[in-house]
Each structure stands twice: as structure tokens, then as C-alpha cells.
Amino acid sequence: MGWWIIFCIKRKQNMKKLLATVAILLLSTTAYADKAFKKCASCHSIEEGGKNKTGPNLWNIMNRGTAQGDYKYSKKFSAWAEENPEWTPELMHAWLENSKKLVKGTKMNFREKKEAKRQEIIDYLTKMGIEE
């Protein structure tokens, strides 16, 4: 699709087609990322100021520390968070792969075995919280 955008810019024509192509690309990327988060949404909200559900609101989670916000974290998770104060992509990969391996007794039951799917979720979480 990138070649089409460059072609339109160089030829200075078809700007309507260029804008339509960019709009479709943006919408499909957002829809794809939303789909990656769909399983997470049953237990987590991801809006700025959103309410906690079974799990905490994940807005801006990749830019904040672990065990932060107004969610009531378990003692085990809070102790683990002291040793792991920030969510890094690597830590989030491990968490999504098997949270119970990292924190025994955590409420989170979700496990994503596929690395590519975990990366999609992490990309989405990273995007959700970036100031525009």
C-alpha cells in the first residue's frame, strides 16, 4: 500500500484516492488491534478514567508502574510488583504467556501461547495511553 501513497504524492493526483486509502488503512489497523484486545476486554477496561472490572483498567499501562492505580491488587501481586516496578514489553510478554507462573494465585486466567498474538496485544496496550 505504501507504493500507492508514494505514487499519488509524486504524481500530485488522485488525492481523494490517497485519502481514502489512508483512511482504510487506519481503520483496518485499529480494528485489527481492537480484535487482539477483545479477549482482554471481558475483564479489563481500557479507557482513560475507565472503571476497573475483574481486572484493573489498562489505560496507559505500558507507561506506568505495575500495581498502580486504584485497583485492589493482591498481596502476592503487590510483592511481585515491588521487584518488577515497570511494565516492559518483555515482562508483559511473560505475563500474557503465563501470569500464574510469575505470580502464584493471581486471578488472571488468560494465557496467550502465540508470541505474535501477545505482541499484537502489547502493541495495542502501548498505543492506548499515548498522548495525542
Where are these predicted regions, by residue range?
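Short, Lys/Arg-enriched N-terminal segments with co-localized hydrophobic residues
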Residues: 1-14
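Sec-dependent N-terminal signal peptides
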Residues: 18-27
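Generic anion/oxyanion-binding catalytic loop in active/binding sites
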Residues: 22, 47, 81, 110
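Gly/Gly-Pro-rich "capping" loops immediately C-terminal to redox-active cysteine motifs
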Residues: 48-86
